[in-house]
């Protein structure tokens, strides 16, 4: 060994030692942050905030907690600010669990399946709920703003470069994601990987595997950023933990009480007199049925169900009813609407998941806020009962 080589050896050793120490420190910090996220789950689980929706740290913490039921949905989980709303009603775990909503206005199934794929094995055996808006399944061209506004580069990257989903499922998901190019602007690595996945060609598959190390590095960087943001949220914005207290809920009595519309609900319930001139019954059935037949929401729901089955999650699929009274006045008959109520459970039950679509409330004006896919206090009482049944292993009631 030459003299210059001997002189370099201590520097090389010192450099390696510094790298090892840095790795140990990062690993320790990572474990501490995860412990903090789990320790504060009682406070963060019932809350709705952007970081929970965009990141994965708080979703993982909820998935690890045996006393928390995650629910994925859209703006129906955010309103109204009534005590019956799920995350408020279950805030103190009156029946033994808290509800943890992950939601954003316009969030849809293509958004949720990316989160499911990103969480992967964390969801194995975990009970969770999915809340669907029926309107998505009745239009051939749903809006794109909900998807673009809720798109999470972190969840998408982790799903694409993670190992939870098989290549065929990733290929089908990639084909749908590429239909929203605006979400992939300035995300060249993710877009390139999605195009390789979607093509299905052997060469592109080999290129994708060559990209895998770079994708995993990107995912790790996203994860570190997410944990530090979670730390900031816990230190600055987390509310004091609620006092958990179990109590006996008389669901029949609660629902009976809420079935009598409260004054606070009066302005939210659509009355027939407020509709425009009634259109001939059934005159718009063909257009409605065409929407139900061709809506891409069915593709996204199937992809979501495939993801849930692949990671071995245990989901409950909930769907609000259609605003039947509105559709009656809009010229869409009940027999046409029944096609949605037939098609939804038929698809979900292929995966052996429980589904509740509240079909019997199709023409109940007190179930939805006006005719929109948002629940009144009465609607939430029914949702709450189904969630409680499901968490405790009972058959969910509609």
Residue ranges and their predicted role:
Residues 76-172:
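Membrane-embedded segments
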Residues 371-398:
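Histidine-centered active-site loop/cap adjacent to the catalytic His
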Residues 1-10:
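N-terminal Lys/Arg-rich, disordered targeting/topogenic segments
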Residues 219, 325-357:
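Substrate-gating cap/lid alpha-helix
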Residues 38-39, 151-310:
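Secreted/periplasmic serine-hydrolase-like ester/acetyl group-modifying domain
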Residues 272-275, 283-287, 321-335:
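Active-site His/acidic residue clusters
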Residues 11-31:
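Hydrophobic membrane-insertion alpha-helices, especially the h-region
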Residues 33-97, 114-118:
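Membrane/wall-proximal cationic-aromatic binding patches
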């Amino acid at each position: 060994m030459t003299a210059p080589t001997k002189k370099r050896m201590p520097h090389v050793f010192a450099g390696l030692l510094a790298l090892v120490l840095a790795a140990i420190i990062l690993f320790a910090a990572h474990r501490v942050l995860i412990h903090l996220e789990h320790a504060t789950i009682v406070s963060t689980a019932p809350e709705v905030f952007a970081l929970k929706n965009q990141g994965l740290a708080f979703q993982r913490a909820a998935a690890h907690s045996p006393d928390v039921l995650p629910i994925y949905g859209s703006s129906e989980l955010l309103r109204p600010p009534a005590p019956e709303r799920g995350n408020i009603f279950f805030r103190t775990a009156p029946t033994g669990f808290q509800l943890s909503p992950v939601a954003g206005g316009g969030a849809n199934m293509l958004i949720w399946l990316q989160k499911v794929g990103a969480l992967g094995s964390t969801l194995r055996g975990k009970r969770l709920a999915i809340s669907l808006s029926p309107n998505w399944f009745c239009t051939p061209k749903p809006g794109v703003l909900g998807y673009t506004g809720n798109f999470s580069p972190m969840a998408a990257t982790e799903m694409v470069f993670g190992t939870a989903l098989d290549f065929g499922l990733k290929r089908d998901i990639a084909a749908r994601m590429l239909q929203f190019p605006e979400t992939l602007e300035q995300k060249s690595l993710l877009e390139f990987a999605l195009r390789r996945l979607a093509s299905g060609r052997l060469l592109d598959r080999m290129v994708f595997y060559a990209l895998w190390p770079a994708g995993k590095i990107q995912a790790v960087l996203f994860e570190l950023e997410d944990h530090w943001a979670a730390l900031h949220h816990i230190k600055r914005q987390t509310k004091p933990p609620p006092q958990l207290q179990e109590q006996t809920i008389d669901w029949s009595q609660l629902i009976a009480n809420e079935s009598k519309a409260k004054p606070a609900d009066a302005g939210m319930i659509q009355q027939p007199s407020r509709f425009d001139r009634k259109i001939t019954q059934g005159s718009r059935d063909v257009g409605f049925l065409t929407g139900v037949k061709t809506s891409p929401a069915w593709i996204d729901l199937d992809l979501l169900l495939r993801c849930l089955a692949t990671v071995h999650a245990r989901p409950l699929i909930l769907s609000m009813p259609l605003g039947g009274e509105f559709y009656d006045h809009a010229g869409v008959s009940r027999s046409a609407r029944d096609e949605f109520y037939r098609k939804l459970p038929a698809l979900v039950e292929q995966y052996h998941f429980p589904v509740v679509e509240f079909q019997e409330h199709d023409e109940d004006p007190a179930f939805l806020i006006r005719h929109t896919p948002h629940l009144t206090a009465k609607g939430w009482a029914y949702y709450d009962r189904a969630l409680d049944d499901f968490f405790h292993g009972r058959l969910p009631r509609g």
